[in-house]
């Protein structure tokens, strides 16, 4: 009379075909590397995954990521400090005039953009320098961040002279050492 079996082309799920694909002979064999994780067999990584790992571990990618992160963090920090500052929007020529909301927002945006650019440059410089130092030394330890902090701080400080460059090197290296000590 009425058949409960549905034809294969009507779009309903056929659990027997799914089970055969997942468990049966249509299942793709997984090649294992015997010593992958301390003797535990692990599957071989496909070429796409290896390529993505190489890209994400490159110094250029790390510097770009630090640049974008520094820009966002610096912008937020700049807008926050402008919001706290009581002199935002005031005109020094006419100190008695109350600034409009448009003037205050313009000043907050300018300060946020200034902080964002500075944080982005410092973040990219430090990250790229640390990656290059780590690649050169072949080690990942606290000395990399101290050396890259000294190089970055010195490069920023040397724009103001030799003394500022030496102080920038020492200050940024010390700050990097403290941050690295607490994060590791």
From Swiss-Prot:
Its main location: mitochondrion. Keywords: Disulfide bond, Membrane, Mitochondrion, Mitochondrion inner membrane, Protein transport, Translocation, Transmembrane, Transmembrane helix, Transport. It comes from the Eukaryota. Essential core component of the TIM22 complex, a complex that mediates the import and insertion of multi-pass transmembrane proteins into the mitochondrial inner membrane. In the TIM22 complex, it constitutes the voltage-activated and signal-gated channel. Forms a twin-pore translocase that uses the membrane potential as external driving force in 2 voltage-dependent steps. This is Mitochondrial import inner membrane translocase subunit Tim22. Core component of the TIM22 complex. The lineage of its organism: Eukaryota, Metazoa, Chordata, Craniata, Vertebrata. GO terms for molecular function: mitochondrion targeting sequence binding; protein transmembrane transporter activity. The keyword Secreted does not apply. GO terms for biological process: protein insertion into mitochondrial inner membrane. The keyword Transmembrane applies. It is found in: Mitochondrion inner membrane. InterPro entries: TIM22. Pfam families: Tim17 (PF02466). Belongs to the Tim17/Tim22/Tim23 family.
């Amino acid at each position: 009379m009425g058949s409960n079996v549905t034809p294969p082309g009507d779009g309903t799920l056929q659990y027997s075909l799914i089970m055969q694909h997942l468990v049966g002979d249509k299942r793709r064999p997984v090649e294992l590397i015997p010593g992958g994780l301390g003797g535990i067999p692990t599957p071989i990584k496909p070429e796409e995954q290896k390529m993505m790992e190489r890209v994400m571990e490159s110094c250029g990618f790390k510097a770009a990521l630090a640049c974008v992160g520094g820009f966002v963090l610096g912008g937020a920090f700049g807008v926050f400090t402008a919001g706290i500052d009581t002199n935002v929007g005031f005109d020094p020529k006419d100190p008695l005039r109350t600034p409009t909301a448009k003037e205050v927002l313009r000043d907050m945006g300018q300060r946020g953009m200034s902080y964002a650019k500075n944080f982005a440059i410092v973040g990219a410089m430090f990250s790229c320098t640390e990656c290059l130092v780590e690649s050169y030394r072949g080690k990942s330890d606290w000395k990399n961040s101290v050396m890259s902090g000294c190089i970055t701080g010195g490069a920023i400080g040397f724009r103001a002279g030799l003394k500022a460059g030496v102080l920038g090197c020492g200050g940024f290296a010390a700050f990097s050492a403290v941050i690295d000590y607490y994060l590791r």
